[in-house]
UniProtKB/Swiss-Prot annotation:
InterPro entries: YaaA. This is UPF0246 protein TM1040_2658. Disulfide bonds: none annotated. Signal peptide: none annotated. It holds the Pfam family H2O2_YaaD. The lineage of its organism: Bacteria, Pseudomonadati, Pseudomonadota, Alphaproteobacteria, Rhodobacterales. One of its GO terms (biological process) is response to hydroperoxide. Belongs to the UPF0246 family. It comes from the Bacteria.
Length: 251
């Protein structure tokens, strides 16, 4: 079982610097995208990403400085809600090894990352357009490349399933049809409030991080074993779940 998670907007360069030991699979493609992004003005970046002028300047400067010679480990660089529960910095050696083999971070700029892949600070969400590039969007740019890489890695590991713990925005970069015979499992985490159930964004992100860690620490390899996930008070709901859409409820 290969595990997919999203990156995060919030970064921790200090923690990640000097910890990278591997080169991203799609470094050439990242360089191509960074070259395109380098041509964007601060105003364009602000509009494309829906961010403030201050953040637009920061990211304009990041693209200008991007060299392809990253020094920060991807797994330690990202610092959002998913990573507060995943906590790669606290993995023991066995879990680190499992994460390097099985955990993959989807990225708008780098495509697909291992925890120790060397990256530079950036912001480029997967759902964005790419003015100046004929693909038009990041989905168009990546096409089936990411899915093909996952299929190749799954074959090398001898596994038959992918645990999708990424957000909808990032999961769209991995079309199920492009995964061939691999089974795509996409858990859903719901909160029960006042007699109704719904997905709450922050809670779902943390639950995805917690499940990723739980799977790695416990050596979970079969989809059926995911039913045992109870971290954070969640419980598997057999009545509303489907084989490729297990639902976990808390409340």
């Amino acid at each position: 079982m290969i595990i997919l998670v999203s990156p995060a907007k919030k970064l921790n360069e200090e923690r990640a610097r000097g910890q990278a030991t591997t080169v991203p699979r799609f470094l050439d493609q990242a360089a191509e995208l960074a070259g395109v992004a380098r041509t964007w003005s601060e105003d364009e970046i602000a509009k494309l990403m829906g961010i403030s002028a201050t953040l637009a300047k920061l990211n304009k400067d990041r693209f200008a400085a991007w060299s392809g010679d990253g020094q920060c480990a991807a797994g330690l660089m990202f610092d959002g809600d998913v990573y507060k529960e995943l906590e790669p910095a606290t993995f023991d050696d066995v879990t680190k090894d499992a994460a390097q083999r099985r955990l993959r971070i989807l990225s708008g700029l780098y495509g697909l990352l291992r925890p120790t892949d060397a990256i530079e600070a950036y912001r480029l969400e997967m759902g964005r357009k790419t003015p100046g590039h004929p693909a038009g969007t990041l989905y168009g740019f990546w096409g089936d490349k990411i899915a093909a890489a996952i299929v190749e890695e799954a074959r090398e590991l001898g596994v038959g399933s992918v645990l999708n713990l990424a957000s909808e925005e990032y999961a769209k970069a991995v079309p199920p049809k492009a995964l061939g015979d691999l089974t795509l499992i996409s858990p859903r985490f719901e909160e029960e409030r006042g007699g109704s159930r719904k997905v709450i964004g922050v809670a779902a992100k943390r639950a995805r991080g917690a499940m990723a860690r739980w799977v790695l620490e416990n050596g979970i390899t079969e989809a059926d074993d995911l039913k045992g996930f109870t971290v954070g008070g969640y419980a598997f709901d057999a009545e509303t779940s489907a084989p490729q859409r297990p639902i976990f409820v808390r409340g």
